[in-house]
């Protein structure tokens, strides 16, 4: 069986590499034509795709997947409509491929500049969310990359149904059908082959929990753009406008639980904790959010608040649970975030401009927010159209990874017969 999986993955890799050589020089109009044809195919096959998703949902329930995973897995008509809108947004994006920047003459008379080019073949490993299949496929096509998608086994039927529509659209436009491939096996050995096929794959994008990220980081022979978990914080500073702080901290936690940009720890300055905490605790109680607090939080709110452990400060709950800590000021808040956070998205609520700038400079996260919800950390909200993930790395791409994150630059040299003396 291992041999057959290896042969299957080698074939997928070769097909992706061949497709990437065509895509790299495909015109913007041709790529947009393919994306428009995919849009039509998805519209025409909505019922079949939603039916496939229901098969996955039923399996998920029978396998006792937790509520956060089931929420990520489910494709409702409204979410399907959102997927289609996201595809429209990608079509409308400016194509970065071929863009020449920093063109300048050198004393020798040659011109030096940089041209934006595709990465080549992207391998993506992710869990649960079928909408990621379409987002990743559309961004790859628009940026001239082939992509190999390995979704979670819990979403296999949904991903296969979406991939069929994508394949149809590519065929209509005359682009290689293997520009986008979904791995159609749940065998974990496929991941091992994908992350070591350096001759076929140029970059790996893992999007999932710590165990997945650790495995890919340890075993990959290919550059990795990591999408790690989102242990996000909001710090309500002493000079915060509480009329802003209340809706921000409520939205950051309760707008949607099972997403990586939801707040998991609330930090409150000790100077306003006595006033702020009872108000926000009342709002959380209405949403049935369980609070786990430090000793000072429990003194203010009462012992019905569970005591927070060291593990709680590190935890991405992806559910209606929130860790709460009262801090002495901005220094303790920043130290806490940089120690326990996942470098994803962290926010401050304050009316003090100097402290806001200090927070922006010192918090080591891919997105740092002032006076707004962490839920804005999203490719669509950032104007990227869609995202392939949110990178917590510092090299190549950081934060929401859109079209530009799937490209690199090469130097170009323009001469008129010059030779080096």
Curated annotation (Swiss-Prot):
Q: Which PROSITE patterns match?
A: PROA (PS01223)
Keywords in UniProt for this one? Amino-acid biosynthesis, Cytoplasm, NADP, Oxidoreductase, Proline biosynthesis
Q: Name one GO biological process term.
A: L-proline biosynthetic process
One cellular component (GO) term of this entry: cytoplasm
Q: What class of enzyme is it?
A: oxidoreductase
One term of GO molecular function: glutamate-5-semialdehyde dehydrogenase activity
List the catalytic activities from the record. Answer: L-glutamate 5-semialdehyde + phosphate + NADP(+) = L-glutamyl 5-phosphate + NADPH + H(+)
Pathway listed: Amino-acid biosynthesis; L-proline biosynthesis; L-glutamate 5-semialdehyde from L-glutamate: step 2/2
Q: Where in the cell is it found?
A: Cytoplasm
User: Highest taxon of the source?
Assistant: Bacteria
Q: Which Gene3D superfamilies match?
A: Aldehyde Dehydrogenase, Chain A, domain 1 (3.40.605.10), Aldehyde Dehydrogenase, Chain A, domain 2 (3.40.309.10)
UniProt entry tagged with the keyword Cytoplasm: yes
Show the stretches that span the lipid bilayer: none
The EC designation for this entry is 1.2.1.41
Family per record: Belongs to the gamma-glutamyl phosphate reductase family.
Role played:
Catalyzes the NADPH-dependent reduction of L-glutamate 5-phosphate into L-glutamate 5-semialdehyde and phosphate. The product spontaneously undergoes cyclization to form 1-pyrroline-5-carboxylate.
| Protein name per Swiss-Prot or TrEMBL | Gamma-glutamyl phosphate reductase
């Amino acid at each position: 069986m291992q041999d057959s999986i290896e042969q299957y993955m080698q074939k997928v890799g070769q097909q992706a590499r061949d497709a990437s050589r065509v895509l790299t020089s495909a015109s913007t109009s041709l790529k947009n034509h393919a994306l428009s044809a995919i849009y039509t195919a998805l519209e025409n096959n909505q019922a079949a795709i939603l039916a496939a998703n229901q098969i996955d949902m039923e399996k998920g329930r029978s396998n006792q997947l937790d509520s956060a995973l089931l929420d990520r897995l489910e494709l409702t008509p409204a979410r399907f409509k959102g997927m289609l809108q996201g595809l429209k947004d990608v079509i409308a994006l400016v194509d970065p491929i071929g863009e020449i920047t920093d063109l300048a003459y050198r004393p020798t008379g040659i011109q030096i500049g940089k041209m934006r080019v595709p990465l080549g073949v992207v391998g993506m490993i992710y869990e649960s969310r079928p909408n990621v299949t379409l987002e990743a496929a559309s961004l790859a096509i628009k940026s001239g990359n082939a992509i190999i998608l390995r979704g979670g086994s819990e979403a296999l039927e949904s991903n296969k149904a979406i991939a069929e529509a994508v394949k149809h659209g590519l065929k209509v436009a005359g682009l290689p059908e293997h520009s986008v491939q979904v791995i159609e096996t749940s065998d974990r050995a496929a991941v091992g082959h994908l992350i070591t096929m350096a001759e076929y794959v140029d970059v790996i994008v893992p999007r999932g929990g710590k165990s997945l990220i650790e495995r890919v980081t340890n075993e990959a022979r290919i550059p990795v753009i990591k999408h790690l978990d989102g242990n996000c914080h909001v710090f309500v500073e002493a000079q915060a406008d509480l009329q802003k702080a209340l809706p921000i901290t409520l939205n950051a936690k309760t707008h949607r639980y099972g997403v990586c940009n939801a707040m998991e720890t609330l930090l409150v300055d000790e100077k306003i904790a006595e006033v702020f905490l009872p108000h926000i605790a009342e709002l959380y109680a209405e949403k049935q959010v369980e609070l786990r607090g430090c000793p000072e939080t429990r003194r203010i709110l009462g012992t019905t608040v569970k005591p927070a452990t060291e593990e709680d400060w590190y935890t991405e709950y992806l559910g209606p649970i929130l860790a709460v800590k009262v801090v002495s000021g901005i220094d303790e808040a920043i130290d806490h975030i940089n120690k326990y956070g996942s470098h994803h998205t962290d926010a401050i609520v304050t009316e003090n401009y100097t402290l806001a700038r200090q927070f922006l400079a010192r918090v080591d996260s891919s997105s740092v927010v002032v006076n707004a919800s962490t839920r804005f950390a999203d490719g669509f909200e950032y104007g990227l159209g869609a995202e392939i993930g949110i990178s917590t790395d510092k090299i190549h791409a950081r934060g929401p990874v859109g079209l530009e994150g799937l490209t690199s630059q090469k130097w170009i040299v323009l001469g008129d017969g010059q030779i080096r003396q």
